[in-house]
Amino acid sequence: MAIKYELILTDRAKQELEDIYEYISKSLMAEKAAENLINKIERNILRLETMPESCSIIEEFKERKKQYRKLIINNYVAIYRIDEENRKVYIIRIVYGGRNYLNEI
């Protein structure tokens, strides 16, 4: 049986999910598409409960004390770190992949 990790979304990541939904449903007037995308993001994040090391390490952050990884979902990127000792995965950010998000972490 696979070891399960606890998933923790930061307040910022939660807000970013809400912002993604609002933008797509209101600005683009595509509520169903917004719902589908949020569901897909959530399903992919849930996958990290059992396979947190399945995504690539963010090379630009290798010099930092904490190791960050990225989960790519469509045009979005979930940035997270793994706390092996406490079996937790912290979802730090959920951002549009087309922007320079590396400077914002």
Features from the language model and the residues they span:
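Compact soluble domain cores
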Residues: 40-49
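Basic/aromatic recognition patch in beta-strand/loop cores that engages polyanionic ligands
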Residues: 53-85
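Generic alpha-helical hydrophobic packing signal
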Residues: 21-24, 44, 68-70
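Arg/Lys-rich, positively charged N-terminal/basic patches that mediate binding to nucleic acids
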Residues: 1-40
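Enriched for short, Lys/Arg-rich terminal
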Residues: 28, 73-77, 81-105
